[in-house]
UniProtKB/Swiss-Prot annotation:
Residue ranges crossing the lipid bilayer per the database entry: 12-28, 47-63, 71-88, 146-164
Gene name in the database record: dsbB
Natural source organism: Xylella fastidiosa (strain 9a5c)
Keyword Transmembrane: yes
Cytoplasmic face of the membrane: 1-11, 64-70, 165-173
Protein name per Swiss-Prot or TrEMBL: Disulfide bond formation protein B
Protein's UniProt keywords contain Iron: no
Major location (coarse): membrane
Length: 173
């Protein structure tokens, strides 16, 4: 069965299931494998959660209005683009030599208690050497590289579900 021909609802719920699976695997690695997430990892998880919620709402609402579907597709694409940017920054921090990145910063909980939300976001995006550690690889790619791959794939899925031309029923059948 061709997934490109699935209904709007099926494609959105598939996107939701992918986001849920990615988050579940990240939590599994944290709780059972002992991989503690850095602040950039947490922001990527938040982006996957928001993506999953958008896919779920779009799939459950299942609007037949073309403009509503385009709005969902655009929101999903923009959220995935933000996630891609965060993951890209994380990959860049990992690929930089460790002595060029500032020393380990404070934990995210401490930052959120002492700073405003925008300052926390700016501080986290500067990256710490903690974010530069590569603790996990699969097929030669680190976790942020895989996150970036999935953000791009989900962005393309968002564009597909939002801007896919609907088949018109024949006038005479």
């Amino acid at each position: 069965m061709n997934a490109l021909q699935w209904s709007f609802r099926a494609q959105c719920l598939t996107g939701f299931l992918f986001c849920t699976g990615l988050l579940a695997y990240a939590i599994f690695l944290q709780l059972h494998q002992g991989l503690e997430p850095c602040p950039l990892c947490i922001f990527q998880r938040i982006a996957f959660a928001v993506l999953g919620i958008l896919f779920l709402i779009a799939g459950l609402y299942n609007s037949s209005n073309v403009y509503t579907r385009k709005a969902y597709g655009l929101l999903i694409f923009l959220t995935a683009a933000i996630g891609t940017g965060i993951a890209g920054r994380h990959v860049w921090v990992q690929l930089m030599p460790h002595n060029t990145i500032s020393s380990c910063g404070s934990p995210l909980s401490f930052l959120s208690e002492t700073m405003g939300p925008f300052e926390v976001f700016r501080t986290v995006l500067t990256g710490t050497s903690d974010c530069g550690n590569i603790d996990w690889r699969f097929l030669g790619l680190s976790m942020p590289m895989w996150s970036m791959f999935w953000f791009v794939a989900l962005a393309l899925l968002g564009l597909l579900v939002g801007f896919k031309a609907e088949r018109r029923k024949p006038l005479f059948s």
